[in-house]
Amino acid sequence: MNKFLIIDGLNLVRRIYAAIPDENDMESLTERVSVACTKLLRIHHPTHVAVVWDGDEISWRKQLYPDYKKGRKPMPEPLAAGLIALQEHLQNLQIQSIYAAAEADDVIATLATKTAKAQGEALIVSTDKGFSQLNHPRISQWDHFNQQYLNIAELEQKLGVDRSQFLDLMALAGDSGNKIPGIPGIGPKSAAELLRTFRTLATLFSSLPNLGAKQAKKLAEGRDMARLSYKLVQLQTDLPLNINLRDFRVNSPTKASSNNL
């Protein structure tokens, strides 16, 4: 069975970079990233590996909602300047890259989903909780920095809702880190309480007459913003990838399947 290790490139690299005392020391960054990737291969024994990188195009999310991720600090100049050399170094280690047009998240989600549907196993290396919406028994997530799999029970306890309600929760409460608006006046706690009672957005919005007047008014006025927020948070899982598994085989290119994804 194929096991695809899918590394969220900037999620890994930027956190390693932040721990380096000298921001211009790209040699140390390259060494630490190489060690991290080698460790990932040693621990998880994948048949295939790829690092997925964000692209420079304006994402469809930004076009849909211009405030999306507004205010985020730009990539530090030394890192931006040294990124190509780092990617080339990984290629020399037989760790190939996939370059998204805009955001890597949708490419990662698509690659993981297609791998799972092809009866393979996908392991996403990222600290991004947004990947928890990929609820499939053959898709898992690994936090390299804490050296552990995403604990769904802990995540559900923290969010206050089931994993299957993640998108609905974000639609109501938003996500301040990504500037996802949610519904004004509905915070994470009240959103979780509503979803524990009504289970889904559809049921919630059809039950507004059963709520208090003030809360019902907030929800009614924020319905369109909830729909927008849901769309912004939802990962695309059906992008055309146009890649060949052979190119991402770990250490055994001559034995690779010629399957396309």
UniProtKB/Swiss-Prot annotation:
Entry keywords, A to Z? DNA-binding, Endonuclease, Hydrolase, Magnesium, Metal-binding, Nuclease, Potassium
Taken from the record, one Pfam family name reads: 5_3_exonuc_N
- Domain of life (superkingdom): Bacteria
Entry keyword annotation includes Cell inner membrane: no
Q: Which amino acid positions bind Mg(2+), per UniProt? A: D105
Q: Where is the 5'-3' exonuclease domain?
A: 164-256
Name the InterPro entries for this protein.
5-3_exonucl_a-hlix_arch_N, 5-3_exonuclease, 5-3_exonuclease_C_sf, DNA_polI_H3TH, FEN, HhH2, PIN-like_dom_sf, Xni
- Give positions of region: Interaction with DNA: 185-190
Q: What class of enzyme is it?
A: hydrolase
Q: Into which family does the record put it?
A: Belongs to the Xni family.
Name of the protein this chain belongs to: Flap endonuclease Xni
UniProt source species: Shewanella oneidensis (strain ATCC 700550 / JCM 31522 / CIP 106686 / LMG 19005 / NCIMB 14063 / MR-1)
